[in-house]
Amino acid sequence: MSQQVIIFDTTLRDGEQALQASLSVKEKLQIALALERMGVDVMEVGFPVSSPGDFESVQTIARQVKNSRVCALARCVEKDIDVAAESLKVAEAFRIHTFIATSPMHIATKLRSTLDEVIERAIYMVKRARNYTDDVEFSCEDAGRTPIADLARVVEAAINAGATTINIPDTVGYTMPFEFAGIISGLYERVPNIDKAIISVHTHDDLGLAVGNSLAAVHAGARQVEGAMNGIGERAGNCSLEEVIMAIKVRKDILNVHTAINHQEIWRTSQLVSQICNMPIPANKAIVGSGAFAHSSGIHQDGVLKNRENYEIMTPESIGLNQIQLNLTSRSGRAAVKHRMDEMGYKESEYNLDNLYDAFLKLADKKGQVFDYDLEALAFIGKQQEEPEHFRLDYFSVQSGSNDIATAAVKLACGEEVKAEAANGNGPVDAVYQAINRITDYNVELVKYSLTAKGHGKDALGQVDIVANYNGRRFHGVGLATDIVESSAKAMVHVLNNIWRAAEVEKELQRKAQHNENNKETV
């Protein structure tokens, strides 16, 4: 009988470290709910002691996610563990994940300590975490470069202290699969109490071996795999969860393990993470790339037509990528749009039907037929722009030509007031941005601009993603329209609203802090 491999997602903690702009609490919650639908067993959603914003996002997710265990990261530091527990206490059940470096290099140069002191600290902090929860994970940072005898000592001590999961990270992506499997096997041979804990692995992709190392570890006895959707993460990224999950499913014959993942949600979750994090998926990415199930060779095409299994070891449908359907038009009613969203697996809580239908009608009037990918794009944009808006694009027009200076006129609703400005620029998009900057006086600096076609052919929607710098912080904005300049303008307005909301959140946090301080003085 096969054993279950626990899937531990760290998209919102380790994965977020790779992003050019931090995610909002709402965006993190949206990803967390998608991960919950996909069936991840554990989700690590932040490092609460690092900032009030991270604390709030962990607390918000812990309050709303019910079917996956929510986890927060903490160093082997008392305050880290206490703050993590405070952020998680609203959850029905939670995990605290604490870590300390164990390799000779890290102990000597980073911690300026000794192995004995590290073990003593690990024992104390695991016990402290156990005061808050019976689910404690302990990580040996840089385990891949830790001598097996030293690693075994740390692991045995952490388990004796109460750790229920022991994580073995290849922190710098250094080990080879056969080496990593040897580390796991070595621990099973050397640690007498190893049956009292789940052995987990956390691999990085610096040498392109993260997935291979994780699978080798599973084959050697690891029963939890940590990673991020689409493999996002600092440097070369984390282990791609979707790749590990599908490898376990497809090669169950030799691995003899399974996961509790709802495979039909993989595609949609991957796309959502890509869009919210503003990290496009390469076409040749395994499992979720746009070319993952494409066949251009004549020999391959012929073979697939005769029997898909000739060249496909899994089907698009197995990850929730269904065939494109069409024929929604401006004559289609709300019920038809809702029915199609239901068929694509969307719950009513994931989109606002009134807003979606209004956007659908406008798009249908422009392009005639509306496809599944159009609906998904409209639903995504609508979800991103549900929050209160201070700025709204009221009107814009541009004039440009091959030998002319581009000029733009823009009207922007700023709260209750509508303001208008005109500006020249290096092309129509730049002219629009210059006009918007004049209206708001925010002096936003564009750092990154990308355009993605949502759909096929000349009627495809254009999605613009931008990253902008304001007062030393980076903000992400997204816009969608059939017109590229309009998409660009909407993306900048989205950035402005994100800046405004961030300022409002900061004011609220300061108000709460002052309130707490006043209460202390009263006591």
UniProtKB/Swiss-Prot annotation:
GO terms for cellular component: cytosol. Residues 392-523 are annotated as: Regulatory domain. GO terms for biological process: L-leucine biosynthetic process. The keyword Cytoplasm applies. It catalyses: 3-methyl-2-oxobutanoate + acetyl-CoA + H2O = (2S)-2-isopropylmalate + CoA + H(+). Pathway: Amino-acid biosynthesis; L-leucine biosynthesis; L-leucine from 3-methyl-2-oxobutanoate: step 1/4. It is found in: Cytoplasm. GO terms for molecular function: 2-isopropylmalate synthase activity; acetyl-CoA C-acetyltransferase activity; manganese ion binding. Its EC number is 2.3.3.13. Its main location: cytoplasm. InterPro entries: 2-IPM_HCS-like, 2-isopropylmalate_synth_dimer, AIPM/Hcit_synth_CS, Aldolase_TIM, LeuA/HCS_post-cat, LeuA_allosteric_dom_sf, LeuA_bact_synth, PYR_CT. Its cofactor is Mn(2+). Mn(2+) binds at D14, H202, H204, N238. Keywords: Amino-acid biosynthesis, Branched-chain amino acid biosynthesis, Cytoplasm, Leucine biosynthesis, Manganese, Metal-binding, Transferase. Belongs to the alpha-IPM synthase/homocitrate synthase family. LeuA type 1 subfamily. NCBIfam families: leuA_bact, PRK00915.1-1, PRK00915.1-3. PANTHER family: 2-ISOPROPYLMALATE SYNTHASE 1, CHLOROPLASTIC-RELATED (PTHR10277:SF9), HOMOCITRATE SYNTHASE-RELATED (PTHR10277). Homodimer. This is 2-isopropylmalate synthase.
